[in-house]
Amino acid sequence: DCMPDTLLDYLEELNRQTFLLVEYGRESTDDATLARINRGHTFACTEDAVRRTAGRGILTGGHVILGLPGEDSEKLIQQAETLSQLPLTTLKMHQLQLIKGTRMAHEFAFHLYAVDEYIDLVIDYIEHLRADLVLEWFVSQSPKELLIAPDWGLKNHEFTARLKRRMEERDAWQGKQLK
């Protein structure tokens, strides 16, 4: 997530000619988590890149994984509030997925969310996000032959329909709990 000024200069010029959105895959706001998953940067580095990109008038997006080891719901709520303070236009989020052949797959001594548990986590999370932040997606799907877990057997649109129903049941909306 290093963004040199020369590249920002180019993107700023390109942004004048066409639609452009730069997405940063930050995955987490917790530096200990970022080190554990070998991201090679701190949150401060990503925050700087986001602010400099948005400061050039470029639409800026983010991407996070919910359910990384060591990140409980309390940490994730704090993460949502932290992200709400950044000049992000869009946010993509998805569940942690264990993929065959990865280091994390060999460890697998941590909690993975069941679908209904994850739906409630997503609702808690988005209640702490700015209302104007465009949420692009809530889940990701890996190829079945590579996926160890979780296998919820849902397409993205099916998950989103369940999420919407649960939000209505809970009288929840984006930004409801943001301080």
Residue ranges with predicted function:
Residues 1-5, 69, 140-145:
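Short, internal active-site loops enriched in acidic
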Residues 13-17, 42-45, 81, 110-112, ...:
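Short, low-complexity, polar/charged sequence segments that are solvent-exposed and flexible
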